[in-house]
């Protein structure tokens, strides 16, 4: 990963073998960013996408491999409530299977860069957002608390 910061916004270039989420979190740690949104695109060769099942309150997982166009990446980084960082990321991948163009998307577990990925990280200005557990679903949601 290499990056540049312009007017407070991080521009990350990920290279072959880099983890998308791992790189975003590493950038935030290096730069002392505790809350941010990010978006991006690129080419990957391995990705785990998940979908939440409200009946079981668990995530089903699917692993994609091969040439995967990272057509859309959107997520956020927040405090995890324990002095660390948490992320919530969704992605859509396009790929060819049996000669037919397909797409798959959902909550992103992680994706490995094949060619490159270009990601823009926008830090939250003037505050910090953290997470708490929603007792009804067992998922982590934004916690505005008294901040």
Q: What are the residue ranges of the model-derived segments?
A:
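N-terminal intrinsically disordered, cationic/polar leader segments
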Residues: 1-39, 45-88, 92-147
């Amino acid at each position: 990963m290499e990056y540049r910061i312009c007017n407070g916004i991080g521009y990350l270039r990920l290279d072959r073998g880099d983890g998308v989420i791992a790189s975003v979190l590493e950038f935030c740690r290096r730069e002392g960013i505790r809350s941010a949104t990010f978006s991006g695109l690129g080419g990957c060769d391995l990705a785990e996408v998940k979908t939440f099942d409200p009946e079981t309150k668990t995530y089903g997982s699917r692993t994609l491999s091969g040439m995967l166009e990272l057509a859309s990446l959107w997520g956020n980084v927040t405090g995890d409530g324990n002095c660390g960082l948490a992320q919530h990321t969704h992605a859509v991948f396009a790929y060819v299977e049996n000669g037919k163009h397909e797409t798959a998307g959902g909550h992103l577990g992680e994706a490995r860069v094949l060619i490159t990925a270009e990601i823009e990280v926008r830090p939250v200005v003037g505050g910090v957002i953290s997470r708490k557990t929603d007792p009804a679903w067992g998922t982590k949601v934004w916690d505005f608390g008294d901040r």
